[in-house]
């Protein structure tokens, strides 16, 4: 019985998710993350939309949450910084809670949706000030979980490099 279940979990049977709306939002998010604040509102708006594929919901929620934390970082007023960051962290918590085994088989830009969601969460948790939001330990735990995942071996090199970069940021933050 276990042998019959094994092929279904292999990357060869993974379902690629093609979602032009996600690709556009991801491009906006990437530019916003690199400092182009004008792209942030577009990313938030697109990630707020219901994905065409309902299985993509955790991925959308994780990126929406991360975009909100970027909005918090860019806000001028302290209460807005807190409001947006808290809203973002709540969205990420929801995304992580929605992950199911089928997200291991759904590919988003060549990466299992479960890994993509966890990396966005971990990167965000490591980036927010730990003295205020107390998320560094959760980020560290997610990074360790991804390192132990058998799915990581089949993930694209770019994804693994991003994981390495988040781990390096964590080590720097812990100094």
Where in this protein do the model-derived segments appear?
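Outer-membrane beta-barrel transmembrane domain signature
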Residues: 128-134
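Hydrophobic, well-ordered secondary-structure segments
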Residues: 119, 140-143
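Structural signature of tandem alpha-helical TPR/SEL1-like repeats
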Residues: 84-87, 135-141
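N-terminal alpha-helical interaction modules that lie
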Residues: 14-71, 75-107, 145-175
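Short acidic, glycine/proline-enriched loop segments that cap or flank alpha-helices
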Residues: 108-109, 133
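Bacterial N-terminal signal peptides
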Residues: 1-9
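Short N-proximal segments of mature Sec-exported proteins
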Residues: 63-71, 116-128
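Amphipathic alpha-helical protein-interaction segments enriched in hydrophobic
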Residues: 110-120, 161
